[in-house]
Amino acid sequence: MFTFSPSFMFDFELTRILGSASSGGCDVGEFKSALNTIKKNDPESWYAAWKQQAERAQKIADEAAKAGYRVLARNAYLRASNYFRATSYMFNNDDARVIPFTDKSIACFKRATELMDGEVLSVDIPYEDGITLPGYLFLPPQYARVPGKIPVVMYAAGADSTKEELYFLYGGTGPQLGYAILCLEGPGQGLLLKKNKIPLRPDFEVVAAKVLDFLDDLSRSQPALELDLGRIAMAGAATGGYFALRAATDPRIKACVSIDPFFSLWELSLTRVPQAFFKLWDSGWVPDGTFDAFTDRHARGNFQAGWEINLGKSSMGVEKATGMFRRFKQFTLEPEDGTKILDKVTCPVFITGPGSGQEMYASADDSTFKIQRLLTKVPDSKKEIWVPNDVADGGLTAKIGAWALLAQKTFEFLDKHFEVKRKEL
């Protein structure tokens, strides 16, 4: 298969950027210019390449806005936002450049939302201890409305995505199909992690409950929005797919879209480490200090492993690999207390997996099919599974490179279960 980079990780992330082109997140010429200067496993060359393209796109956007070209300015601001997101992506979260470029990505995106066809609400959702969860509520323009009130999709970020990037899957497409899309960042995601150092939490149903309460309050205070709280779906990809299943235990969620989720983060980690050594540590035969030293040495010699370990420690709120792996045990659909999370899910579920054998993380055999079997409270008529092989069909993790097709399959599923009727064109 053709690759953009000899680095598996760089190739995946480049495909991720180019894959957003169908929704306005990338231009092929800008992509090729950036690609020309990126070196294998060299984060500085990645940074320089995307910084150049981000600043270029922002300049084009500013010029288009000054000239009164709404659509052209919007499109360029969207690309600039995505490129600024990519700029610092390969750095650890403690790098001084991460927050400034995240802020630039947000600023360009917010400028783009001012130029969109439908109304976009920038929201702050009350969470706990005075903390709010940031998000965008994309509303359908009047010409795209479907009969009745507006169905809602709550779309959660994953381990490394941002609420701005989420636009390029459902945020752009959903409103054009009559759906309201709430793209949000929870604890351990986006600036809540990078700036506030708030880690991920495994019981995402708690987070989802706060978001659902917010939607209820918003609907009561602004009835003119016509949000249909009887038709709320939850969606997420990879780690977000796990979060979507946890959120679906709330009866207010009426449909769940879980894209390439993991079943257990601990079990997933076992597929990516020397298992004999790992099990010796887990059983107490290898001291923490020895295990941490080994992991640190491995991280220094392997760029992808180092990046993943640093993100893992950051998102788990710990300083050592041993603490990270212990926290991984909490991120599961079958916690150690014996609770069977999936027994609490009764709504229709659309679940996907990567079938190409090129999965970045969770495989379909270890996660997707297992989850399908354990969703015993969901009738077969309300369970849909999609595990494509070819990259064009969504064979890569999180359906990278096939977001347009994923969006089509998602809204076909939601239309069916939310009884949205459309006319054949």
From Swiss-Prot:
Disruption phenotype: Does not affect the production of xenoacremones A and B but leads to the accumulation of 8. Pathway: Mycotoxin biosynthesis. SUPFAM superfamilies: alpha/beta-Hydrolases. The active site is at D366. Transmembrane segments: none annotated. It comes from the Eukaryota. Alpha/beta hydrolase; part of the gene cluster that mediates the biosynthesis of xenoacremones such as xenoacremone A, a compound that shows inhibitory activity toward the PI3K/AKT signaling pathway and which has the ability to induce apoptosis of A549 lung cancer cells. Within the pathway, cooperation of the hybrid PKS-NRPS xenE and the trans-acting enoyl reductase xenG is responsible for the formation of the reduced tyrosine-nonaketide derivative. The alpha/beta hydrolase xenA then accelerates intramolecular nucleophilic attack to give a pyrrolidone derivative. Belongs to the AB hydrolase superfamily. FUS2 hydrolase family. PANTHER family: ALPHA_BETA HYDROLASE PSOB (PTHR22946:SF13), DIENELACTONE HYDROLASE DOMAIN-CONTAINING PROTEIN-RELATED (PTHR22946). This is Alpha/beta hydrolase xenA. It comes from Xenoacremonium sinensis (Endophyte fungus).
